[in-house]
Amino acid sequence: MQESFLFDPVPPDSNETLEEINKELLERARALPQLSGRVFILGEGVKGARLALVGESPGPPDAESGRPFMGPTGDLLERILQAIGLKRSDCYLTNVVKYISTGDELTNDILNFFTPYLQREITAVKPNIVVTLGNRPTKALLNSKKPISQMRGVWQDYRGIKLMPTFNPAYLLRDPTKKREVWEDMKMVRDALTASS
């Protein structure tokens, strides 16, 4: 890939629709040889959702259903949301990269291709709060080099939107000892949502 879009300006009050953003993303992604034949899983939820959750990339259960955050990772995410009084349908769910990939496959070129679309997606949804699930989503939106272990639990600002970095539910399935930290982060999200309603 030759194109680098990471720092393209995104109008803060864009009137783009999610449909327009997704159409452009799919047209451009399908034209790239390294992405041909991929199954793309786009964001799910409504414009105006108060909470947006951003993961790294879809997993195999997502491809089967065509929806983000399915299977064991999605089940755990739904339990986390229920614990703070939300349902999946209350939120907007998306990933930085829109196709199933391995961690090794996520080069800077791939991330630079997808990040501006994620930024435009967040602008179109207009959530009150964004929760980034893991290193790559946090770096994509905040352009930070710090690991998630140093970023989590501290409110960040993303273009005037409160952003809470935390661990990805997929990581919690591998290391359940981090659940307490995610619970502390999500209580802060719950309190901020309550205060803004």
Regions inferred by a protein language model and the residue ranges of each:
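A polyanion-binding, active-site-adjacent surface
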Residues: M1-S197
